[in-house]
């Protein structure tokens, strides 16, 4: 099998499964739908692992070829092609591996759904295909189509429960916010096409960069900026939307309206990292603009810290993990801004495993609670759901950067990158990611203690109905006991827990300080020496653990865990008093810094008001009543006056004729004798 055939199979098999489940779902039934989609994704996952292994043992080399030319227009070729190198192979394994776990998990999670089961499997397989096309693309046009395709599937899955108004509002919100980012992204691609040699293929664009290194572009009369800086910032606007960076982050928490499996696959492990992948892929361009890198670093730092604050007050178990995702995406963005692209991609990989684990473990707890997602109704689930308890504990330990866990190696590397960066804004970024260590540990173990320890709070609740998951689900009754989820749910948790523990230790040296990303990621070490300094300071994975004992990071994490234990296990009455004492801050967090209100009341209502103005004034008053109906009324008015001349009496017409003759004679004599 040649390489082209291999890569086509990896990309297209999930699409085939999606089409079969979507078009023939009623004929093949529920079992047929999940079987065909799981087989398709499993084939992709196995072959992706085979590709990655080939790169690791040196038997495989970089592949960059076009599959076919889709359109030729004015000398410009729009082609479909594959660029498969070590970064692509790593992402292929992450996407297909997590997707496979999610597919298997979905069998148990969606078991009670009466409608839409086949549709759901079709959607998540379609997403897998779309994400593979995005990361395997070798040109901007295919990247953009993959970019839009994953956005479309995200829209469909967030609104999966389309009869629920909150779900339809959430998917529309996600769609519109991402259109803002995509508009900037498209403008950036337009600049690449116009000024970077007239090609959209990555290798051609990178080769042309020396020709535009000092070029400028006029933004306004008298205002010129570096062409590369403007291009980088516009492309990053797209990443801000897709990877949920401040202030385009507001769609991601609401995306929790979709079923939990897609929260794990799309909104934690894969799609939201697409923007980060794009920036890493474009490292040769970004390395030419320190201004763009500074902006990226500051945006990431703001997201990491201030989205973490919002996670502290959440009571929905999935929303805690959602805000955790926002904060971790901010960490990765800080690494990009520090020119530590390999560190960002390393955290993309480790985060994909432990965050998917956290989402799926949260979903397992939700199943045990009969689809009640409110953590205030839980407690002591450790007694009833030991596998869910242990796997969520592992996920949280990795999230907060506990030594020897995967998240420790990648998260601490990001903090080191911010520390050693010399770009403007790096001081703020270092402070923000340090402070976020405490915040992350606090909200992660606040969730853990509320769910798995303490009193069994559902026993003291009145009988209630919770329609958060479909329309026929109820919370636990007072005398009910939760039960551990079935094997089809817990097996993916166990399998995801393994890389959440070991993958960081295994991968840190080759990915960050070895040749794994050689000729894939470009860093200008003279201008941005962060990775060079980090390499000199690195003495092995075990030495990194011992070094952490002398770092504030570990003690900030411990302080966060102890604070959560004190407030939610030992003194559970205290959080309410603290919230009351700091009421203005709590209200600010509760209203999510009022950004939703700003967007709704200013931009949404403002746009509607502007549209209403143009409708009533421009369309109705000027065009309809003025130009169209007004011209008709004017003709009618003139005709009404002319009709008055038509009296029907002969002497009136004779008098008019005599008057006309006299006027003509007068004009004649005037011309003769003047």
Cite the ranges covered by each PLM segment.
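Transmembrane helix-loop-helix hairpins at membrane boundaries of multipass inner-membrane proteins
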Residues: 1-6, 24-122, 195-224, 229, ...
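Hydrophobic transmembrane alpha-helices and their helix-loop junctions in integral membrane proteins
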Residues: 98-146, 152-479, 505
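Membrane-entry segments of alpha-helical transmembrane domains in multi-pass membrane proteins
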Residues: 1-12, 28-35, 39, 76-94, ...
